[in-house]
């Protein structure tokens, strides 16, 4: 185990050193409720292999990990009929808002237009076109 893995918050959750509310788990991934819920049911999916972010992924890592997004999203939707939509968010690197340096995907259920938004939606079409 590397020093990075030893001190990694999500690696500690995978090893059971830190408790979590697990939604889904198998040999490849663990999904659990985010401690800082943007909305009720906000879930994180993490690979059990320590990868900092998508820049570290091989094609095999991506295939192994990303296939579970729809499985977990469908389970979240099935668990709560009030869910009308779902944001799937990934922050790669500190500059992009990544806080825990272990790759993870946010699944944020949406029930109404009044739900808090974690990513600001700004129209920059004039600036970037």
Task: Tell where the protein language model's regions lie, with residue ranges.
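HIT superfamily nucleotide-processing domains
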Residues: 1-129
């Amino acid at each position: 185990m590397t020093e990075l893995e030893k001190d990694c918050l999500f690696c500690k959750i995978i090893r059971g050193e830190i408790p979590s509310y697990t939604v889904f788990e198998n040999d490849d991934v663990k999904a659990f409720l985010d401690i800082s819920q943007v909305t009720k049911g906000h879930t994180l999916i993490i690979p059990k292999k320590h990868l900092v972010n998508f820049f570290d992924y091989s094609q095999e890592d991506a295939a192994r990990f990303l296939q579970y997004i729809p499985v977990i999203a469908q389970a979240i939707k099935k668990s709560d009929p009030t869910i009308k939509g779902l944001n799937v968010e990934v922050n790669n690197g500190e500059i992009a808002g990544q806080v825990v340096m272990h790759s993870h995907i946010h699944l944020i259920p949406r029930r109404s237009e009044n739900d808090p938004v974690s990513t600001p939606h700004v129209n920059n079409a004039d600036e970037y076109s």
